[in-house]
Each structure stands twice: as C-alpha cells, then as structure tokens.
Amino acid sequence: MQKIAGKAAASPKKGGAPNLLCVWASAEKPPPELARVTELHSLMPWGSLLRGMLGSDTEMRPGLAELCVPGAEFLITLNLHAWRPPVPEVGDHPEPTPESAMELLAPYYAAAGWTLEEARYFGAEELDALATSWTRRLGSTRDELDVLGITGVIGK
C-alpha cells in the first residue's frame, strides 16, 4: 500500500490520484471511511472474500452494500481454476457458470440489495483490461485463465 500511496501523491499529470484512500480492513467489517462508493470491484477474490461472494458468508455483502450509494455498479471476477481441483474456500459450491450464477447466486445477492444483471466468461482482452498484478500472475501460470465475470447494481 505504501508504494501505491506514494504514486497517488504525485500530481495528476504524473499519474497521481488525489482521491485515493488506502485501507487495511476486512470485507466483513469495512470501515465507514469508505462510504459513498459508486463502483465496487472484487477482482479474483480469495479466502473469506471468495466465500462471501459465493454466498457462504451472509454478513459480508450487506456490509459492503452499506458503503455504496444507491445504484452503485459492481464487478466480480471469479477465477474458475479455484474449482480445478477445488480449494477449501469454494466449499460445496459447484463451479459457477453464467447460467448457474444467475440462477443460484442471484438470490444470495438480492437478499443483500445486490441485483445481478449479467454473468459471462471473460475473454483475453477483458482480462488484460483488469490490469491487476494478481490477474497477470494467475495468467502467467497457465495456458488459459478461465474467469467468470458478474456485473450488476447495488441498492437499485
């Protein structure tokens, strides 16, 4: 976080981000300083964040929703290799597909005020556009990275 904060402190002309807020906290109990979020991304979640995005943790999604303004858009990207073979974080959840996400995950999300609008497999260009070091690292260890993208709105 220190490296990112240093870059953010630069002038906007040099890539600085005057509105960056770095927080070390859990998704289960996010700090109120993060309130008024207009767009929420959970890119390749792991551990408790992955369990929460799969519906195993019923507290996390409402907590995150409280931080968002009504109508905030969200993007969740799931690394499907977590099911090949299954890691403990996925529990008994079957590997999601676009169809099963809309059918099985949508009710979990709706209970917390999240509306799933679309679930689809991401192609190489979309994965590159995520531009995260974790996505690059995952992609470098296999011939093809299979990712399910889920989008929607919170508090609509």
Swiss-Prot record:
Disulfide bonds: none
GO biological process, one term: methylation
The UniProt record lists the keyword Methyltransferase: yes
GO molecular function terms noted in the UniProt entry: methyltransferase activity
InterPro entries: NpmA, SAM-dependent_MTases_sf
Gene3D superfamilies documented for this protein: Vaccinia Virus protein VP39
Protein name: rRNA methyltransferase
Organism of provenance: Saccharopolyspora hirsuta
Name of the gene: kamC
